[in-house]
Structures are given as C-alpha cells and as structure tokens.
Amino acid sequence: SKWIRKYDKDLSLILTVSPLERKSFLGEDYNYSPEIIQTLGFPRFDNLENNNLKKQILIMPSWREYLQKSEFALKNSKYFKGLNDLLNNEELIGYAKDKGYKIIFKPHPNLANFIHLFDLDKNIIVDDKNTYQELFNESKLLITDYSSVAFDFSYLKKPVIYYQYSDDYNFDLSKSYFDYKTMGFGEVIKKDDDLIKLIKDYLDNDCEMKEVYKKRVDEFYKYNDQNNSKRVYDWIYEN
C-alpha cells in the first residue's frame, strides 16, 4: 500500500508474514532500510483458530474507490452487477440450503453504505455485527476477488476462491508481487457458472482445502503459529 511509503509515514517497523512480502517492501517504491522491514508475522493472526466451525460460506469482496461518489455509477458497474447476481444465484442458494450451509455476505465498510441498492435474496445473511476474525474462524469457505482477507482465511488452511469477474481493481502500486494464479491460496475464477460448480464441489467435500493450496500456504508464510505477538514484542524490546 502506497500510504506507508517512507516519505509519507517514516515508520519504525513494518511487519510482514512472508519473505516474499518483505522483498517487495525493499523495492524503490517504499525507500525503507532493510532493518525496518521484518518478517515476524501479524499479531492479529494469533486470534485465528478453527473453533466453533459452522456450515457457512463467507462472501467478502474488495471495494472500488472510484465508485464511491455515485450510486448510479455503482449500480451500473460490472462490479456491482456481478456481485448482485451472485447474491441472487438460485442454483447456489438452493444447493447451499440442501447441504445445510448459510451464505454470509460481509460487505466492505464503504460498500455497506450502498447495501440498499442490492436485490438481496432472503436467504443471504448480511453481517453487520460480527468481527472479521469471528467470521474467519467460523466459516468454512471464503469467496473474495482481490481482498487481503484471503491471507487471514488461508492462514487457517481453509479454502479460498478468487472470483475475479471484474478486472477494474486498482492496486495501490503499479505491480503487486503477489500473483493470484501462481501464488494464490485457491482457484481464480472469471465466470459465474465455473464459480457455482466449484463451490458445489467444495461443499461436497466438506470444504477441505486442496493439497496444492495447503502447500502454497506452507511455502508462503514463514510462521504458521500463534506466537506472532511474542516475536513482535521481543523485536521491539531488543531494538
């Protein structure tokens, strides 16, 4: 994110979860010295655990900043139409119901301001009460597009689907180090028919993360434990 560049913030410590992420911060876009950027893990990850698992599918798309000021522009965008169609997909809703799954829609805070524009099926639960971590811990399957919530969810080794039907997402910097197709923790899907088929496959297999993606999780995160806060505390104390 460009807002943490040195001449904007001049931070004393930047935390990363992966050596690859750390390497990306060492580029010229940020201008920090290497000792400032540490791969210690995120303290918030310590609260992630697969407890109180429920049969629920979590839908959490990213936001499009350029649609912020106009309801008309939002409602007529490919981004909105694709999401609205998903939230009204009769095949998905019916299959989830048959399998005993609830579908939870957790809109981005900015998108929540426009929730009245959606034609929401009565079986879709719009969550405005639970924290992100509560939903991550409880849910069995995540559907997002480009959102960083996939990192939190994949830390638990639960399946992620990147539904990237709209290619209008604006990355903060010109090129991200993270390639969704080769590094992502789940399938990258463009078409709604393919998405529904894949979701049904996951529900048929109790939402078990596939081995190829478990391997990617293991390769990406330097640590997969609940000692992130301790590592950060120790580093601050020693420095």
Predicted features and spans:
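Active-site and donor-binding regions of nucleotide-sugar-utilizing enzymes
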Residues: 1-47
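Acidic, amphipathic alpha-helical patches
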Residues: 4, 92, 132
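A short beta-strand/loop micro-motif in the catalytic core of glycosyltransferases
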Residues: 12-18, 102-104, 142-143
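Short, solvent-exposed loop/turn segments at secondary-structure junctions
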Residues: 19-22, 43-45, 62-66, 109-112, ...
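Catalytic binding pocket for nucleotide-activated donors in carbohydrate/polymer assembly enzymes
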Residues: 32-33, 119, 148-220
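Conserved catalytic-core segment of nucleotide-activated headgroup transferases in glycan assembly
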Residues: 38-116, 189-191
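Donor nucleotide-activated moiety binding/catalytic core segment of transferases
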Residues: 109-151
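C-terminal alpha-helical cap of glycosyltransferases
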Residues: 225-239
